[in-house]
């Protein structure tokens, strides 16, 4: 085996960031593109050092005419490498990027669960991280959206998603594939400029590189890395603040299905008033995530946060689903909208 600088870098990253334990089962998501081929080749070469059992999973979205041929191509690669292969095909074509991503992670989790894989590994790179940060920035987001692709995150209670290539650019994965003559399957949808992410990749980032910083891609990805550490700290601190400020009391019906129907949730305003605005907002977002069916937006978070310093008996307009929040002295009370006071 030829040991390259990229092999050494990924080996070092896995060890220093504690991405995997040795002698575990890793399910590698392989589309057939350059990033996933680079990933599986690196893991196969590192396998003797770590004692992993590797499997390859391919998800066929059925949104290209050549998708079946693409799946067969990946299956043949897996057979040539002597690696278990798993194929999941969408029952109907998946038409949006968001829907495709959600279906893909569900499919990968199901395969991993059925075949006892502890890790799902994807080939997301620093280039993907930069694109995701820019995409979220233009949609409007906080630091949580700007941290853009984390090294690890749990998909289920016992399956961890891992992205070992987040410090590697797409240019590097292309060079690696060329060096080892890996047969890349070109995905024609990556060239389709109707997708916002493709416009960022094909037009915006090259413009930034040509006119502002040749290393713009890495610089933006490094910003995401710095923000990730900040977000993790703020989330932990906000969780502690929430636990300090939050109380349950017997009273009117509270909306959270996970709570006993006889309990009301109330928040101590004096505790929250001592905290900086950044933590106040995070506490309110965490609370709203528990009681709303969909993710809270900026307006929802702001109107609940405003009650921390609002006059007595101030209250919000109803949130989606009917919940309202009202100030009662030193407390913010979350209650059913039908109980709204006049």
UniProtKB/Swiss-Prot annotation:
Keywords: ATP-binding, Cytoplasm, Ligase, Nucleotide-binding, tRNA processing. It catalyses: cytidine(34) in tRNA(Ile2) + L-lysine + ATP = lysidine(34) in tRNA(Ile2) + AMP + diphosphate + H(+). Gene3D superfamilies: 1.20.59.20, HUPs (3.40.50.620). One of its GO terms (molecular function) is ATP binding. GO terms for cellular component: cytoplasm. It is found in: Cytoplasm. It holds the Pfam family ATP_bind_3. It comes from the Bacteria. GO terms for biological process: tRNA modification. SUPFAM superfamilies: Adenine nucleotide alpha hydrolases-like (SSF52402), MesJ substrate recognition domain-like (SSF82829). Its EC number is 6.3.4.19. It is an enzyme of class 6 (ligase). Transmembrane segments: none annotated. ATP binds at residues 31-36. Belongs to the tRNA(Ile)-lysidine synthase family. The N-terminal region contains the highly conserved SGGXDS motif, predicted to be a P-loop motif involved in ATP binding. Ligates lysine onto the cytidine present at position 34 of the AUA codon-specific tRNA(Ile) that contains the anticodon CAU, in an ATP-dependent manner. Cytidine is converted to lysidine, thus changing the amino acid specificity of the tRNA from methionine to isoleucine. NCBIfam families: lysidine_TilS_N. This is tRNA(Ile)-lysidine synthase. The gene is tilS.
